[in-house]
Amino acid sequence: MKTAIVYATKYGCTKECAEILKTYLHGEVNILSAKADKINLSQYDAVFIGGSVYMGKIQKEITQFCKRNLKQLLHMKIGLFVCCYTPKDTEGFFETLYPIELINHASYVTSVGGKMDYEKMNVLYRKLFHSLKKIDGFNEGFTEPEINESEIKKLA
């Protein structure tokens, strides 16, 4: 079986998750950037699609990839994932990120967690998070996100 993992990432976490996912898959697996690669799906039996979520939106490259390839994807085995802090069981969350047809067709749809790499963040995001951490009570309800490898294994 030949599998593609198509991803888009802002700071590298989604690519890292794609690389972890690859270790759980069998056969030939290619990791492809939705931003950089022209992707010919006809050579693949299965496709996993993942992106990171910022301000409630997934990268436009993932949205465009899904729209452009929707008909073909609906005839393939697919899995969908996001890297974010939102739990996978948040009602209606995935419907704002992926076409409903893909969600209904997918073998598995999940959030695989994520991580905050402050060194890679732009100045605005870095200042925002450092400011939030200074607010009384914020740290009580906040824990640094982590990549959920067990959820990645389920996706495979």
Predicted segments with their positions:
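N-terminal beta1-alpha1-beta2 submodule of the flavodoxin-like/Rossmannoid cofactor-binding fold
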Residues: M1-L74, K153
